[in-house]
UniProtKB/Swiss-Prot annotation:
Residues 1-23 are annotated as: Disordered. GO terms for molecular function: digalactosyldiacylglycerol synthase activity; glycosyltransferase activity; UDP-galactosyltransferase activity. Residues 10-23 have a biased composition (Low complexity). Its main location: plastid. This is Digalactosyldiacylglycerol synthase 1, chloroplastic. It catalyses: a 1,2-diacyl-3-O-(beta-D-galactosyl)-sn-glycerol + UDP-alpha-D-galactose = a 1,2-diacyl-3-O-[alpha-D-galactosyl-(1->6)-beta-D-galactosyl]-sn-glycerol + UDP + H(+). The lineage of its organism: Eukaryota, Viridiplantae, Streptophyta, Embryophyta, Tracheophyta. It comes from Arabidopsis thaliana. It is found in: Plastid, Chloroplast outer membrane.
């Protein structure tokens, strides 16, 4: 909590002699200053009102007593007037007797006055007994004077007029001398023993003598303001102290760890009652430490013998003091919340986002749209959010976004222009950082926390190995009922091209097996070009943008009318990095330069290796025309007849599928990544460099065949979604959900494989929690948690608040 220093207000009409330092101290807003000043002044008035109300009540009680006494005297005189004996003019002896009787009553009145502490109330009461009573036959003036004289000898005090106070408070300017006018007329001696009133009166007199400028100029240094500032400081201090909850100490942390690890300890033979005794011993150790502390807080903490409840209360107090929201333990979060009937939730987590035109940005977006189109499940697409400095490095044409909402609007607009319907799914962002060395985006922090527990049902991890290399968070299979991984990239092929690539590929191969087994229930490989991962099957679950199929239909109609559909030759399109097939392309063109003759190839692409690629092509004097990168659906690319893709690092080239959908020839390598495309007649594969030349010449001299409806359907996202539902087992899961038998994690005894998977996940969690090991294995610095810029952009709670207790 950020504190604001409280500074008293200062008048804008200060004299010119006011120093610059004093004016600097009055820069706080007048609204805040006047608010607490008015509050302090209101407290003074409330306190004075309370005292005056008490005085008024006491005065009224004695006044009522005097009125009662007055009525008794009147009754007495009336009864005397009705008596049979005539009442004549009073004699001196009768007056003496009456005075004697009243003097006997006087101690009782003094007793009332002392009990109720009403200053000069007796004088006021006796003033009501005027000479008018003489018309009844008795002159009581002598009685009044005698009683007053007796009372003045006992105590002299003044009386505050309540009505006068109320009138002065409503006037424009309060004159405190008039407030005490009656007291001044009666004499200063009446207030001689009433110290609070005398002190207050002198203060008000001094205050009235000052001018407005003197009051305002001296107000900031007044004792009242200093005390008020001290009071506010004490209030803020008490608030901070109240929120300052001590962190969990070592015995409490160990007890908490033992309780959370009960399922794991049960698997290795440690019974629950043994765990309870360990927790109890640790709590007793904590209690013994508290006994040594001579404080009331310690005695309060050890009053309760229920150690389990005590530990829960301590953890709750620490979490509440930090604002952390706890969703469950590492081992105990097995039972997921119930989902609405016939409605499941699918979260798709990917490693890239538009406007970066890469496969992991485009394909998950289409998958989310077509899964949401089925309306059987709600869908959330979770994409990385990059800070502006990283956006400038990744997104083309210097395109940047100032907020996630702005980027989400761009993504939805781009998608709706291509699919032709409004996709009803949610887009969420997680913090990400771009690595220049790896040319990839890596998650920062626990990605799973950006999917709420109530929506944690089915997770689809696009590139599960990439997402989990340095993942340090809750295990995906513990938070979600079913986790499917989709392998997009052949990372081993990329790594082999680097320095010491064979050694690095060996370790990465085992790490990929490790993380996919620990965090996935099912793994889908787009082609056999990827490594054989645990729990994996090969299936192409990608489709093409409907716009490409429409282009293919349009070209087929033009050809049916006898028009020339293709007026251009061959082209290649892809990100301009060596691993995307540019090395193979230049080698093939350079080796068979003479056989290809005047064959020209237009190359579209942007990338980090653009300068080196163009330099290599120029060195071999190749007929390559390098052009700026374009969207594959751009009108400028419709008239090309042949698409050449010599890449063998792709898992499943999206551009190849798009070219086939547009009715073009495709010349590609005979490689597992192209296995899905071999069934299409327009796909020409080659095994050798000589075969490459013959396939290029064949494509340039012939016309491609139009696609059949079945072939077009196999390339569509509808077919890809159907294949995905089948091979990921989602159709079985969703059908079971519709039948009322939802798949749920349970606390039943796990199998041996599940125990091994849990151990792998736990060891990975421990190792990725060490910053030194992360840096040694190539992690992007400061990706264990998101940074302050991510907190500002995504309105996140700082990591030290989100993880207040402990971490690995």
């Amino acid at each position: 909590m950020v504190k604001e220093t409280l500074i008293p207000p200062s008048s804008t009409s200060m004299t010119t002699g006011t120093s610059s330092s004093s004016s600097l101290s009055m820069t706080l807003s007048s609204t805040n200053a006047l608010s607490f000043l008015s509050k302090g002044w209101r407290e003074v008035w409330d306190s004075a009102d309370a005292d005056l109300q008490l005085m008024r009540d006491r005065a009224n009680s004695v006044k009522n007593l005097a009125s009662t006494f007055d009525r008794e005297i009147e009754n007495f005189l009336n009864n005397s007037a009705r008596s049979a004996f005539p009442v004549g003019s009073p004699s001196a002896s009768s007056f003496s007797n009456e005075i004697g009787i009243m003097k006997k009553l006087q101690p009782k009145i003094s007793e009332f006055r002392r009990v109720y502490s009403a200053p000069e109330i007796s004088r006021k009461v006796m003033e009501r007994w005027g000479p008018a009573r003489a018309k009844l036959g008795m002159d009581l003036s002598a009685i009044k004077k005698a009683i007053v004289s007796e009372m003045e000898l006992d105590e002299r005090q003044g009386v505050l007029e309540m009505s006068r106070l109320r009138r002065r408070r409503n006037s424009d300017r309060v004159r405190f001398t008039e407030f005490f006018a009656e007291a001044e007329r009666d004499g200063e001696a009446y207030f001689g023993d009433w110290e609070p009133i005398r002190s207050l009166k002198s203060r008000f007199k001094e205050f009235e003598k000052r001018s407005s400028l003197e009051i305002l100029s001296g107000f900031k240094n007044s004792e009242f303001v200093e005390k008020l500032k001290t009071s506010f400081k004490s209030i803020y201090k008490e608030t901070d102290e109240a929120k300052d909850v001590p962190p969990l100490d070592v015995p409490e942390l160990l007890a908490c760890l033992v309780r959370q690890s009960e399922p794991f300890l049960d698997q290795i033979g440690v019974r629950k009652d043994t765990c309870d005794r360990i927790v109890e011993s640790l709590c007793k150790c904590k209690s013994q430490q508290l006994w040594r502390l001579p404080s009331a807080q310690a005695s309060d903490l050890i009053e309760n013998d229920n150690h389990g409840v005590d530990l829960d209360m301590r953890i709750a107090s620490v979490l509440q003091s930090t604002g952390h929201h706890y969703d469950g333990g590492f081992w105990t979060d097995f039972v997921k919340p119930e989902t609405p009937e016939n409605k499941r939730h699918v979260a798709i987590v990917t490693t890239a986002s538009l406007p970066w035109m890469t496969g992991t940005a485009v394909n998950p977006l289409f998958r989310a749209a077509y899964l949401a189109k089925a309306a059987k499940q709600s869908v959330t697409l979770v994409v990385p959010w990059l800070c502006e400095s990283d956006q400038e490095l990744v997104y083309p044409n210097n395109l940047t976004f100032s907020s996630p909402e702005e980027q989400e609007s761009y993504i939805r607009k781009w998608l709706e222009e291509r699919i032709g319907f409004k996709a009803d799914f949610k887009i969420s962002f997680y913090p990400g950082k771009f690595s220049k060395e790896r040319r990839s985006i890596f998650p920062a922090g626990d990605t799973s926390q950006f999917i709420s527990s109530k929506d944690a049902d089915i997770a689809i991890l696009e590139e599960p190995e990439h997402l989990n290399w340095y993942y340090h968070g809750k295990r995906w299979t513990d938070k979600f009922n079913h986790v499917v991984g989709i392998v997009h990239t052949n990372y081993l092929e990329y790594i082999k091209r680097e320095k010491n690539g064979a050694l690095q590929a060996f370790f990465v191969n085992h790490v990929n097996n490790w993380v996919t087994r620990a965090y996935c229930d099912k793994v889908l490989r787009l082609s056999a070009a990827t490594q054989d991962l645990p729990k994996s099957v090969v299936c192409n679950v990608h489709g093409v943008n409907p716009k490409f199929l429409m282009i293919g239909e349009k070209i087929a109609e033009e050809r049916s009318r006898g028009e020339q559909a293709f007026s251009k030759g061959a082209y290649f399109l892809g990100k301009m990095v060596w691993a995307k097939g540019y090395r193979e392309l230049i080698d093939l063109m350079a080796k068979h330069k003479s056989e290809l003759g005047s064959f020209n190839l237009d190359v579209y692409g942007n990338g980090e290796d653009a300068v080196e690629v163009q330099r290599a092509a120029k060195k071999h004097d190749l007929n390559l025309n390098f052009l700026k990168g374009r969207d594959h659906a751009d009108d400028a690319l419709h008239k090309y007849k042949v698409f050449i893709n010599p890449s063998i690092s792709d898992v499943l080239c999206t551009a190849t599928a798009e070219a086939l959908a547009m009715g073009k020839f495709v010349v590609c390598a005979d490689h597992p990544s192209n296995e899905f495309f071999r069934s299409f007649p327009n796909c020409l594969t080659y095994k050798t460099s000589e075969d490459f030349v013959s396939k290029v010449q064949e494509a340039m001299t012939k016309e491609p065949l139009p696609l059949t409806p079945e072939q077009m359907y196999n390339l569509s996202w509808e077919a890809a979604t159907q294949r995905f539902m089948e091979y990921s087992d989602l159709d079985k899961i969703l059908n079971n959900g519709e039948g009322g038998r939802k798949m749920r994690k349970s606390r039943s005894v796990p199998s041996f494989n599940e125990v091994v998977d849990g151990g792998l996940a736990f060891s990975h969690y421990v190792l990725t929690g060490n910053d030194f090991l992360r840096l040694c294995t190539g992690a992007t610095p400061r990706t264990k948690d998101y940074d302050n810029q991510h907190c500002k952009d995504l309105n996140l709670v700082p990591p030290h608040v989100h993880k207040p207790i402990f971490g690995w």
